[in-house]
Design a protein with these regions (language model features):
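Conserved NAD(P)H cofactor-binding loop of Rossmann-fold oxidoreductase domains
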Residues: 11-13
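Helix N-cap/beta-alpha junction loops of NAD(P)-dependent oxidoreductase domains
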Residues: 16-17
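C-terminal substrate-binding/catalytic lobe of Rossmann-fold NAD(P)-dependent dehydrogenases
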Residues: 66-72, 82-204
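Rossmann-like NAD(P)(H) cofactor-binding subdomain of soluble oxidoreductases
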Residues: 20-87
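An anion/phosphate-binding loop that grips the pyrophosphate of nucleotide cofactors and donors
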Residues: 4-5
Length: 204
């Protein structure tokens, strides 16, 4: 609607079973090219959250085609991947998901990666936690990091295969972002945004 404070962009062709996010890019970039100028025209001061896939590509496309400021446009990025990471680890370790802090970086989907050195359990490095738990006789299952990253990367495809779409997980994640943007929730998380030299990356 005209004058909106937040615009959530979900427009795009749905991902088919077996289809990669990159295969969606050509069609969905064209859709973004058509709607981005209209959003800029009717809600020029809005904060825009891009959810459509491939989200990182489309966030960049929306920013370029809309002409809006970089601090007005973000994508859902690896937010959902991060939730899947903490969920999987909670199952492997037998502890509450809220006790685990960690992030998934990179592109949303099959090329994402986990910086394991940043994963903690109540502030304790993950490897230190598992070693300490075993010393104390606490059940801390050994887990295969490769299995965890496979779960994180492939969960979306499995959900699409079984249910046809991934509505609820991403919707819940975007609600958290909206609440943070409106000041209703203090949240530190991962999103897609324009880079200018951070981590040695520029104009991405």
């Amino acid at each position: 609607a005209a004058g909106s404070d937040i615009v959530i962009v979900t427009s795009g062709v749905a991902r088919r079973p077996g289809q990669t996010r990159i295969e969606l890019a050509k069609t969905n970039v064209a859709i973004m090219k058509s709607i981005a100028p209209q959003v800029a025209k009717h809600a020029p001061n809005a904060l825009c959250i891009i959810v459509a896939n491939p989200v990182d590509v489309l966030t960049y496309a929306f920013l370029k085609y809309s002409g809006m400021k970089e601090n007005q446009v973000i994508g859902s990025g690896t937010l959902l991947d991060t939730v899947r990471l903490t969920y999987k680890l909670s199952q492997e370790l037998g502890i509450a998901q809220r006790s685990i802090k960690g992030y998934v970086f990179g592109e949303h989907g099959d090329t994402s990666f986990i910086p394991w050195s940043m994963v903690t359990v109540e502030g304790i490095k993950l490897d230190e936690y598992t070693k300490g738990a075993r010393r104390l006789g606490i059940d801390a299952n050994d887990f295969d990091p490769d299995e965890v990253i496979t779960y994180v990367r492939k969960s979306g495809g499995e959900i699409i295969k079984r249910k046809g779409a991934t509505f609820y997980g991403v919707a819940n994640s975007v609600v958290d972002v909206c609440e943070a943007l409106m000041g209703a929730q203090d949240l530190v998380t991962v999103v897609s945004s324009m880079m200018h030299g951070e981590y040695g990356v520029d104009d991405v």
